[in-house]
Amino acid sequence: MKTEISTLHTEAVYSDDYSRRYVLRKLWDDSKPKLAIILLAAGTAGTVMLDKTTQLVINNSARLGYGSVSIMNLSAVLNDYHLHHTEDPENIKVIVEEAKTADKVVFSPGTAKSNNPNFIRLQEQVLLALRPCEDKLYCLCNADGGARLQHPLSPQVQVWNLSPLKVSELVTIPEETEQKPKKKVKPKESKEPQQETPAE
């Protein structure tokens, strides 16, 4: 008979008034790669309780060979599933910092709210902020590469496959207008008429 002992270390980062949860970190093996995932809205899962989404995230992250996962959301406001809040610079800051230290970043808020103006606004804010990390940005898909951009609760992607994601697939990237240095105009040289040498 053999006994295996494993520890699931959990950190939950909240706002001072506990109205927002910025990140939920789960660590079970720090020798393995780190995953970050961005979902829709922060739920009730915390340091002890696990909701179904968190269970699916942990199980699939471990199955794919990761040793930790940082769970974040477009809206950090607890249970803000209708997305009433669209401005949260602190949430954007946390998402970017977690993405920088992750090996892969999964963007997975789902498509159910894709016509919601606040969803569109939040998605744009987050994805534009993640452009420096675009080389490690992915979304969920099924085994055939279809059903992209689904939330982990979608039956089509409850067994994860990861597909590379470009920011430009979901948001319009503003044109970067570079100010070209003005060319220095050289003053024209005045040409004096040559005097003819009189013949001797």
Residue spans for each PLM region:
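Glycine-rich anion/phosphate-binding loops
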Residues: 48-53, 86-90
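Short, glycine/serine-rich, charged loops/turns that create anion-binding
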Residues: 42-44, 76, 112
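Residues at the starts of beta-strands that form the adenosine-phosphate
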Residues: 34, 67-68, 104, 136
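Glycine/proline-rich loop-helix segments at beta-alpha junctions forming the active-site rim
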Residues: 79, 84-200
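Short connector loops at secondary-structure junctions
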Residues: 66-82
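Short catalytic helix/loop segments, enriched in acidic residues and glycine
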Residues: 54-62
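Active-site and ligand/interface coordination hotspots across diverse enzymes
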Residues: 1-51, 192-200
